[in-house]
Regions:
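Non-heme di-metal
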Residues: 1-173
């Protein structure tokens, strides 16, 4: 990431800041997604779904590490990510005190969103065509993995809770 230009997305400060802001949410977000699935993992009896959960946890951990490294590069340019990430950490503390069903519903919503975003990126490679090569590699890799495990949180939710009321409510919020 150290080689990535400051305005790495279409040479645009706005688009670069937008993508960097999105990236800065991933380490805490990915950790929360893992937490929400682990909350109920012991209730899942299906071996295939357990294997998918294990893969999901591994992929989310890799995403968190990759985006932590990507985000660290922006401190060189005096991006103030620490204040934003402190705000995210306070929100994370709040949602981790919600009922596990609500936490998993939140994860379902975000995983759905990131899979849609990942699908868009892969169907429209021109969107990322103006990024530095290292940035393209990060975002395309992350997009592929989001699509690969897009249904895991949903499948866990259905397996454990079997209803849509809370999940749909959270999805609309």
């Amino acid at each position: 990431p150290k080689a990535i230009r400051r305005h790495y997305f279409a040479n645009s400060p706005v688009m670069s800041h937008l993508l960097t802001a999105l990236s800065s949410t991933f380490p805490i977000g990915e950790q929360f997604f893992v937490h929400s699935v682990r909350n109920v993992r012991d209730q899942v009896k299906d071996d295939n779904l357990q294997a998918q959960i294990a893969a999901f946890i591994g992929q989310e951990a890799m995403h968190s590490q990759a985006h932590t490294a990507f985000n660290a590069a922006w401190r060189r340019d005096d991006y103030n990510l620490d204040r934003f990430q402190a705000w995210l950490a306070r929100k994370d503390d709040y949602v981790k005190n919600l009922h596990p069903k609500i936490q998993l519903a939140i994860t379902c919503a975000f995983e759905h969103f990131t899979a849609l975003l990942g699908g868009y990126i892969l169907r429209h490679p021109e969107v990322l065509s103006t990024l530095d090569d290292d940035a393209v590699k990060l975002w395309v890799w992350h997009a592929i993995e989001e699509i690969e495990h897009r249904a895991v949180a949903f499948d866990v939710y259905q397996d454990v809770y079997g209803d849509d009321k809370i999940r749909r409510l959270i999805m609309r919020s």
